[in-house]
Amino acid sequence: MSRAVLALLLLSSFSCWSQNYPARPVKIVVPFAVGGSADVYGRFLAAKLSDSLGQPVVVENRPGGGAVVGTDAVAKSPADGYTVLVMSNTHTVNETLIPKKPYDLMKDLAPITGINSQDLLLVINAELKANNLKEFIALAKSQPGKLNYASSGPGTPYHMAGELFKHMAGVDIVHVPHKGSDQARTAVLGHQVDMMFDAISTIVSHTKGGKLKALGTSGKHRSAVTPDVPTIAEAGVPGYEATIWLGLMAPAATPRPVIDKLNAEVIKAINAADVKENWAKQGAVPMGMSPEEFGKFLREDVQKWSKLVKDTGMKVD
């Protein structure tokens, strides 16, 4: 049989198979604890895809090892489109921060598309004697190593936002990792920890209620959700920028027609007018892009955080 005929038969087989996909439930693995942004938006996506694909799409939370446990499970799953991964900045950070992983992000997983991105909010507990970012930086510099900040775990976007802040502001603030965003948030609200970065959508209500002080947002521009809060760059740390983003990947050998189908359905879901409107109120921006564009985005993000890890000598806590 000639190569051309074989290729044609394989293409026909994939095309027929993908037309019938999915023929059974699809599982979205979220390698983070319940309650964080990845979990919230993963469940949103599951509901939307259940409707559009005509099959149940279920979420399975598999936290552990800084997202390594759940990610490895997906990387080793059958490459048939029935197990996919919600992933984030944590994964691109881990490429440098955790070099001895049981998988290689860019070799063992295939990019599908980006889901959304959000700016973060730098908050401090209300008891601290600082009312703006410059005062907080001055306070931290006056007592190096005494103040601390919470994160949802090593290598998470919240951890990296904190390390980038320390590096650029020139302050010594101790990292206190927690098992998930909910625990980190509770620690700051309970005045057990001084500061944290969190997604605007999940923390803003506590700042409006006076339990926390909002000192700055992490994006290039002020957030529409908190228009009175300056960016960290304009409030005292020029050039600072950090966001949290989410994306979707599948095992590396997943057939391209399946990747394309999932890509199209996700983009359709996140670009719906009602979704855009709802997300805008939460400070989330749709990120729909082609698999190639998302792959390029991932490689660039790996490079960005690799530089910070190397510049600071950062290690997994």
Regions found by a protein language model. Give the residues of each.
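An extracytoplasmic/periplasmic, membrane-proximal ligand-sensing/linker region
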Residues: 23-25, 167-169, 208, 231-234, ...
